[in-house]
């Protein structure tokens, strides 16, 4: 349980020491006329899918908020290696105002709030819309609405962690706005405490809807429902690689692993409450226990990746350790983009441009000096270089993610 909860509750403690006043006025993009986009239920589906695509962009979770800028400021890369780019070197030193880092920081802020603007537009339009517009009526309308609320909470929370001090430092400080309306006007900044309350309010409104859909209305997409004895491995396959398992409802209601689902909500709620401080710890415990007791111990919808899936041949290895992933965004070219960033244009290069720092000092060896930790021996690659020796295998393509996404 400790390992699972640590995965759920981990939060980046660093903050970006930049002024964001100049970026508060972010005008929403409106590429398609509202009357056209929101005139059908399929238009709402397309709008939500477009938001997921934007979340997976390079500026956000497709790069900078996963293996890019965020990994650099959390000291994962060896900034002393001569192969690392100036941007990652500066970010690793927590220097945010250089010619290399400042554009990245600005793009994260602007793209994050543009995604929020699009979510607000979707939320405001779907609220008064009659359920008859949707193929699956109230359930479909509510699902789209709840996912949009949850994504708005998630995006705001990550912007808070990046652009404001930790809650314990100054909870009454006001650093950035919580935008819950679709408008171009500058919005007053919230205190950290009020900001977190707004995050939790969005999650609370979405919680019962997602719970009902994922555990009662259509649980078939959350676990290996067609198997006599489902395992965490096959449950993960159903969520992330639905493929031939899709029923008559269609792909939009499957692939729940790459859509914000009820398990993801419980995990995010626990993280937010831990970040918020002692007054919220009980709520964090409640969410984490439900996730662990119900969906790990009882239903086994999630679990730990078996050793045989890690120690096998690299081409078959589950380097994402995927059986307990609650939610992930789909990006078709992720492996290609990461390979290009690590090795450059030369397929024969043996020098990584994103070398991991402090390896193998992070892992213990046995009394003979041999390292037996699977994370080091099977999930981290090595080169013959000294300062650029180690690199992650996490983004190596694995069998679990080879089938096409519904948005291909």
Give, region by region, the residue ranges found by the protein language model.
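Conserved, well-structured interaction surfaces
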Residues: 45, 53, 85-163, 183-197, ...
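Bacterial Sec-dependent N-terminal signal peptides
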Residues: 1-29
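Short coil/turn linking the two alpha-helices of tandem helical-hairpin repeats
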Residues: 160-161, 167, 275-278
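Elongated scaffold/linker segments in the mid-to-C-terminal portions of large proteins
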Residues: 100-103, 212, 222, 228-234, ...
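Membrane-proximal, proline-rich intrinsically disordered regions
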Residues: 20-74, 331
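Aromatic-residue-lined binding/catalytic grooves and analogous aromatic/hydrophobic interfacial grooves
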Residues: 21, 262-263, 268-302
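A short, hydrophobic C-terminal helix/tail in secreted or cell-surface proteins
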Residues: 404-408
